[in-house]
């Protein structure tokens, strides 16, 4: 949105889902794919809705909506080799090295992942809170002001390897 505007934010989500259910309690499902309605599709759905609203609201800043792939690839739990962080977030790793515009720099970015779970609760993710605490505070305060405070809990959560890990 507004590609010529210098003042930009980036919104991210991944559209893939885990190719196998290796953490499922039922071992028979360990080599079947995950459906991905929450982990994959929910963030994409929210960003598509944001894009629809951008046509009406016309914010002053530029907004880049980025869909990445292979966030959930990783290695299967049965794999006997090393389980490395860089096996995850393949699309975001690629995008971080090859942004859509040379020298791209957003003021901040927001990753939407697993936002469609029943009774979802969002806490400050550790890396995000370390790198951009002011952005976290703004998002959580805005959510609270809009009546969504029960979902955006103002407490620290843990560290999560996700697309933001590689983009930060």
State each model region's role.
Residues 47, 139, 166-167:
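Structural element of the ATP-grasp superfamily
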Residues 154-168:
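Zn-dependent metallopeptidase/amidohydrolase metal-coordination segment
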Residues 31-134, 163:
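Acidic/histidine-rich catalytic neighborhood of metal-dependent amide-processing enzymes
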Residues 2-5, 15-19, 70-74, 114-119, ...:
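Solvent-exposed loop/turn segments at secondary-structure junctions
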Residues 1-33, 52, 56:
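Soluble metallo-hydrolase cores and metallopeptidase-like ectodomains found primarily
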Residues 58-64, 150-157:
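Surface-exposed patches in mature extracellular/periplasmic domains of secreted proteins
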Residues 131-151:
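Acidic, glycine-rich loop-and-strand cores that form catalytic or ligand-binding grooves
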């Amino acid at each position: 949105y507004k590609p010529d505007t210098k003042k930009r934010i980036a919104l991210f989500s991944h559209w893939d889902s885990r190719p196998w259910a290796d953490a499922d309690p039922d071992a028979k499902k360990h080599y079947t794919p995950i459906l991905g309605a929450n982990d994959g599709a929910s963030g994409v759905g929210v960003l598509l809705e944001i894009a629809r609203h951008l046509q009406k609201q016309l914010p002053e800043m530029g907004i880049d909506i980025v869909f990445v792939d292979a966030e959930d690839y990783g290695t299967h739990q049965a794999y006997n080799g090393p389980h490395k962080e860089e096996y995850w977030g393949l699309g975001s790793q690629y995008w971080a090295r090859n942004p859509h515009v040379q020298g791209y720099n957003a003021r901040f970015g927001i990753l939407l992942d697993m936002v469609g779970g029943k009774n979802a609760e969002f806490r400050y993710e550790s890396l995000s809170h370390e790198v951009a605490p002011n952005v976290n505070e703004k998002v959580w305060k805005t959510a609270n002001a809009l009546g969504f405070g029960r979902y955006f809990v103002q407490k620290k959560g843990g560290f999560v390897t996700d697309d933001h890990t590689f983009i930060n």
